[in-house]
């Protein structure tokens, strides 16, 4: 039997829009605007719009380059 308490949690590869907003410290509306403008990449999986972890990193990198 595997002791689940000893296993490390698996980090998510995809975030719901609300989770992405929390990670970026932005409002949900602001994240949807970034998605609409093409500045934040998403994927569609099982009728859900999800934000890949890599897309969050790409967006933050673009902010750093623009600074």
Locations of regions flagged by a protein language model:
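A generic structural-conservation signal
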Residues: 30, 43-44
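Minor-groove-contacting beta-hairpin "wing" of winged helix-turn-helix DNA-binding domains
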Residues: 48-53
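Polyanion-binding surface elements
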Residues: 2-33, 37, 57-63
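Alpha-helical residues within helix-turn-helix
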Residues: 19, 44-45
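C-terminal secondary-structure termini that scaffold catalytic or DNA-interacting sites
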Residues: 66-67
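Proline- and acidic/polar-enriched loop/turn elements at helix boundaries
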Residues: 33, 46-47
């Amino acid at each position: 039997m595997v002791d689940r308490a000893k296993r490390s949690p698996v980090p998510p590869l995809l975030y719901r829009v609300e989770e992405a907003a929390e990670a970026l410290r932005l409002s949900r509306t602001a994240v949807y605007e970034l998605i609409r403008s093409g500045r934040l990449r998403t994927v569609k999986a099982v009728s859900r719009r999800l934000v890949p972890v890599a897309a969050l990193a790409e967006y933050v990198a673009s902010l750093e380059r623009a600074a």
